Amino acid sequence: MVVLKGGAWKNTEDEILKAAVSKYGKNQWARISSLLVRKTPKQCKARWYEWIDPSIKKTEWSREEDEKLLHLAKLLPTQWRTIAPIVGRTATQCLERYQKLLDDLEAKENEQLGLISGEGAEAAAPVNDPNSRLRFGEAEPNLETLPALPDAIDMDEDEKEMLSEARARLANTQGKKAKRKDREKQLELTRRLSHLQKRRELKAAGINIKLFRRKKNEMDYNASIPFEKKPAIGFYDTSEEDRQNFREKREADQKIIENGIRNNEMESEGRKFGHFEKPKPIDRVKKPNKDAQEEKMRRLAEAEQMSKRRKLNLPSPTVSQDELDKVVKLGFAGDRARAMTDTTPDANYSTNLLGKYTQIERATPLRTPISGELEGREDSVTIEVRNQLMRNREQSSLLGQESIPLQPGGTGYTGVTPSHAANGSALAAPQATPFRTPRDTFSINAAAERAGRLASERENKIRLKALRELLAKLPKPKNDYELMEPRFADETDVEATVGVLEEDATDRERRIQERIAEKERLAKARRSQVIQRDLIRPSVTQPEKWKRSLENEDPTANVLLKEMIALISSDAINYPFGNSKVKGTANKVPDLSNEEIERCRLLLKKEIGQLESDDYIQFEKEFLETYSALHNTSSLLPGLVIYEEDDEDVEAAEKFYTNDIQRDLAKKALECNKLENRVYDLVRSSYEQRNFLIKKISHAWKALQTERKNLTCYEFLYNQERLALPNRLEAAEIELSKMQQIEAYAQQDYARVTGQN
């Protein structure tokens, strides 16, 4: 049988839903719906969030809520899920209230226009009826938002079964395993009883079986848990409170014991002296009077509350007693004048001339403000409802229609909350009572008001005159117009315009830096090749010794050596290598210009070109011999030949150069270590990635080899199957023909047998 779930909610189902939500929470709707036979999880969830939830407001709609609802419906049309939390109601309540406001105003307008009258008006559904929007034969679509139906006296069997099952499941606080737990408990009880019966029978037979007792300082690992630490009962440590309770209990026990001993001593003394009276039965612990204790606690609470109250500090009065007396006298004078005029025959004429000073106008609004209908105007709710009806009746202006003329006023579009217009009522105006004279019917302050009005008019005239003077100082407008033919810019004009443009500071700075860098490059190019290549320069300059050691019979060679020594000394002094200090003096060789350097190069090329090939070969041979002779000496350091005449100079030079070389070697070693560490830091990630890629490639290669083997096997199988397929097909066809023949013979036999019968 198919069971259709749904329908109106009953009181029993609501109560089951409340209890289920309190136990299972607001997320397990499938489990909750299993308790309700006729409801789905979606319906249970909707019922909770639309009706049963305690946070849902079911009171009458206030004016502020109506204004907020209409304002949000105007800003967010048909977005009721978004509007509901802002208004503080459910989405269904907001929609129903919105429709009700529109229906009420529409019915009111129809009644005013006379569209509903006579029998039609009496037959029409009431406005407040929630079912008036339903047609005949239609069902309520939102049954979850309606009150629950009362339970029937005679429930159906399925309802009774549902109720009993829900009661049993909700009463089960031990979870789904309650039956198994009860069964295990019964089995444990049976096992214990059987064990006792067994011990009793063995004891009757003379066999005593004692329970195992643990020896001292030993542990039974089968019965206890080693190194067990029991967790705390709660979130906080209450050991100190337990100790304090134990101490208090022990002191109370001691007092009871002492009181009992004293009573026994007094009883024995009374018996000794013969005037013993039977003591009254008293309790061991004196019971306090409950009412007196409650009264005492109440007084303590009141005293504590009184101590919490602060002293009332009122501000000082703004109106003195003299001013109050003057106001009272003015009121009495007006009352006396009115009483005197009322006694005369023509009291009406004089009464109209006198003001009434008994009723004081207040700056605060009344408790019951005047509604818009009493003032002859419509309130914001009615205006918004009428505007919404007009929007619903007409097409939107986005479809090409004219804009709908809406009624001005309402809640506006300034924000999420509706905006209220300023109240024009004199009773609610905050400045309706001007300071000391709330009413001036007798024109007591007419002179002061007139003087103030004249002063303000005079100030306005002065301000207007000053404004006119300032406007007169403005230059007169020129209305000379001249039409010119547009002229397109030529290339020359573009170049002129570009030249006129001011150069940017960043471009100028970059241009200056480039110019300085170019000058430095040209200056470095004019220096020697040792400086350009940043080669090592000597740290000690001794031009005279160098000249003596390199003197030659050829005057041309001597000139060249002299220039070379001067250039080496100048480079060592003017451009020291690194941060080393150079010992010795030398004359600075001036830098040559670019033209002079180019001229020298041309002369060298010309001179070298004039040399014959044999001379050039001889020159190269002599150069190599000289170079090898200088660098293959027995001395530890090259270049010490110049110190052969002086042993002390040789020893000092060796020591100096040795220390410098060792220091440079140590420095270079540190730099190399730093560079190696830096290179390792930079390359480590790449090295790890390389290893990872190598492993990945190896795995991929193995997988590729495996797939190739599989492909070869499958191709071989394919070829074998393709070759064997015709044979198998032929065998199957032969088998089929045999089966057909056998079946034909069987049919003939069957026909023959049936024909004979």
From Swiss-Prot:
Residues 29-52, 80-102 bind DNA. The keyword Repeat applies. Residues 271-319 are annotated as: Disordered. The keyword Repeat applies. It is found in: Nucleus. Residues 1-56, 57-106 form the HTH myb-type domain. Pfam families: Myb_Cef (PF11831), Myb_DNA-bind_6 (PF13921). Involved in mRNA splicing and cell cycle control. Belongs to the CEF1 family. This is Pre-mRNA-splicing factor cdc5. It comes from Schizosaccharomyces pombe (strain 972 / ATCC 24843) (Fission yeast). The lineage of its organism: Eukaryota, Fungi, Dikarya, Ascomycota, Taphrinomycotina.
